[in-house]
Amino acid sequence: LALAGISVADTAPSSAAPAVLANVKAGETTRMVYELEAKAYVLFIPATGRAHFDVEMRPDTYNIKSRVKVTGIADWFVNYDMHLQASGYTRGDELKTYNYVSQNRDGKKNRRVNLTITDKDFSMTANPVFGNLGEPPATTEQVLKTNDPITALITFALEPRAPGADPCGGPLRIFDGRQLTYLHLKNAGTKQI
């Protein structure tokens, strides 16, 4: 088992991130492309994960396309290749999920999940269907307070924070069509990596 991650926080009061969503809402279409790579060892096998995010934000809507894949020798043992797409609404201080599609190409189930969240309800289809939806499954009230995984990540990076406030903010509320997750981040300070 291996775990790799990166956390970056800017606690400066004049951070440019809050301005991004405000500028988009004011009419400035913005496109961002993120490329991430993480390396770890699983037992003695080097594992590399790559993620690509293409984010386009317009004054009222946004669209995110992403691909996450394990590469190298680890790909022989862990066939993880996920294509993700999310779209929704641009608000002054956040993005809000309307539709999320994930297509897992793992060579086994190759599951496709389609999630739609409205102001009052949500619907989800999975093919093949999930064996269960968690115990207990997420309620409509819980899901309406969430975003899909990639929207939650991008919103976290862009949401405004008051000067001196915890740069990690509150929990990230995430729903992927099956699992409800409240991800609590902890500020570990600035580190030289």
For the regions a protein language model found, what residue spans apply to each?
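Solvent-exposed helix/loop surface patches that form functional interfaces
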Residues: 29, 110-193
